[in-house]
């Protein structure tokens, strides 16, 4: 746990959450790359799937892209934000419990995607394949992250905000809007839903 110096009283930064997100980043990067190598092998030699539906290119490609987007990129973004934000604002993250809920919730989302995508449970919309319960979980975990994020800004120990913090704010808001608008749907069953605002051919 790093301690800030040069302030009225020392600040113990929550580096444990940074470490967790970093370990998750490396782990999921390896998983995503291994899936990518396997589906590349399938393109060159299709019998690699051994006739198992869950190992076919069509099932594993969404798993690969989602692993790279949500697991690798998502975790590394959170690693950077949790590390730099505390230091730029000279304050510990607003709520340690919310930080842990954010971390474990995000990893549960990734595991859920890794289980459902190979089973063919998708919305069939590229880069928004995840079924509605997982989409709703993403929204919930993002709200937890946003509350902790803006709570930290509200309790900062510096008067000004660095440009990086403004970029982080736009990241939090933009991704929330993008996710919600891109995944508007009416649930039909536990694993099926109807998309709103998309033409079906």
Give the ranges of each region predicted by the language model.
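Residue-level detector of conserved catalytic or cofactor/ligand-binding positions
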Residues: 195-201
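Transmembrane helix-loop boundary segments of multi-pass membrane transporters
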Residues: 127-131
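Inter-helical turn/loop segments and adjacent helix faces that build the functional surface
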Residues: 152-160
